[in-house]
Amino acid sequence: MAKKSLIEREKKRKILVQKYKFIRQSLKNEIKDASSLEEILAIHKELQSLPRNSAPTRLHRRCFLTGRPRSNYRDFGLSRHVLREMAHTCLLPGVTKSSW
């Protein structure tokens, strides 16, 4: 189980990303449409003034149940350990153990 402070930090980042999503996107579109270098630099400065954690690249996928940051499956939102346990107990519909 991951530290609760790290899980809460990720939750705050998700909220910030959602809050500044449209502002960040509009500024990026303005940069594409800008004609002069001064305009681009001014808009870029506004973009840099946004909170650092509002950038979507700072988000990290974590396991929905345990908060484990590594080896997550995107389809399920679970780490490999939890996925294996849940698959063995038939809690994931449609997931079967492969054999050949």
Curated annotation (Swiss-Prot):
Biological function: Binds 16S rRNA, required for the assembly of 30S particles.
Subcellular location(s) of the protein: Plastid, Chloroplast
Protein name per UniProt: Small ribosomal subunit protein uS14c
MF-aspect GO terms: rRNA binding; structural constituent of ribosome
Family membership noted in the UniProt record: Belongs to the universal ribosomal protein uS14 family.
Superkingdom assignment: Eukaryota
Organism in which the protein naturally occurs: Angiopteris evecta (Mule's foot fern)
Summary of subunit composition and partner proteins: Part of the 30S ribosomal subunit.
Cellular component aspect of the GO annotation: chloroplast; small ribosomal subunit
Keyword field: Chloroplast, Plastid, Ribonucleoprotein, Ribosomal protein, RNA-binding, rRNA-binding
PROSITE patterns the UniProt entry points to: RIBOSOMAL_S14
UniProt cross-references to PANTHER family, sorted A to Z: 30S RIBOSOMAL PROTEIN S14 (PTHR19836), SMALL RIBOSOMAL SUBUNIT PROTEIN US14M (PTHR19836:SF19)
Main location: plastid
Biological process (GO), any one: translation
Chain coiled-coil ranges: none
